[in-house]
Amino acid sequence: MAPKAEKKPAEKKPTEEKAEKKPRAEKRVPGKEGGEKKGKKKAKKSVETYKIYIFKVLKQVHPDIGISSKAMSIMNSFINDIFEKLAAEAAKLARYNKKPTITSREIQTSVRLVLPGELAKHAVSEGTKAVTKFTSS
């Protein structure tokens, strides 16, 4: 029975050690181990924008004019909205004709329906030119 009495004081020592380990855990958060985690960076989500292309067109039309980031964001949103409208209209046309695919014809018709007057005519001519250039190369 005497050995059991000796075990009780031994059990108190690990509890004292656990109390000592708590400050170590606190040190880990701001310590150097956080620096080691910098090696593993999260992969950035690729967000597709039209900013580069908007800028290229701006420089073709007005080489001396710049654009603010807020204006660029508005232009990017505008292009996304127009493309969504065109895609939705092209999808409707494909469904009406009971076709499973959206072809250049559906896109051309949706451009004529979504865009007004002269803008539609210019868009159709530029689109036709782009498709012809793509198929010839």
Curated annotation (Swiss-Prot):
Can be acetylated to form H2BK6ac and H2BK33ac. Monoubiquitinated to form H2BK143ub1; may give a specific tag for epigenetic transcriptional activation. Residues 1-45 are annotated as: Disordered. It comes from the Eukaryota. One of its GO terms (cellular component) is nucleosome. Transmembrane segments: none annotated. InterPro entries: Histone-fold, Histone_H2A/H2B/H3, Histone_H2B, HISTONE_H2B_site. Its main location: nucleus. There is a cross-link at residue 133 (Glycyl lysine isopeptide (Lys-Gly) (interchain with G-Cter in ubiquitin)). It is found in: Nucleus; Chromosome. Residues 1-37 have a biased composition (Basic and acidic residues). Keywords: Acetylation, Chromosome, DNA-binding, Isopeptide bond, Nucleosome core, Nucleus, Ubl conjugation. The modification N6-acetyllysine is found at residues 7, 27. CDD domains: HFD_H2B. Disulfide bonds: none annotated. GO terms for molecular function: DNA binding; protein heterodimerization activity; structural constituent of chromatin. Belongs to the histone H2B family. The nucleosome is a histone octamer containing two molecules each of H2A, H2B, H3 and H4 assembled in one H3-H4 heterotetramer and two H2A-H2B heterodimers. The octamer wraps approximately 147 bp of DNA. Core component of nucleosome. Nucleosomes wrap and compact DNA into chromatin, limiting DNA accessibility to the cellular machineries which require DNA as a template. Histones thereby play a central role in transcription regulation, DNA repair, DNA replication and chromosomal stability. DNA accessibility is regulated via a complex set of post-translational modifications of histones, also called histone code, and nucleosome remodeling. This is Histone H2B.4. It comes from Zea mays (Maize). The lineage of its organism: Eukaryota, Viridiplantae, Streptophyta, Embryophyta, Tracheophyta.
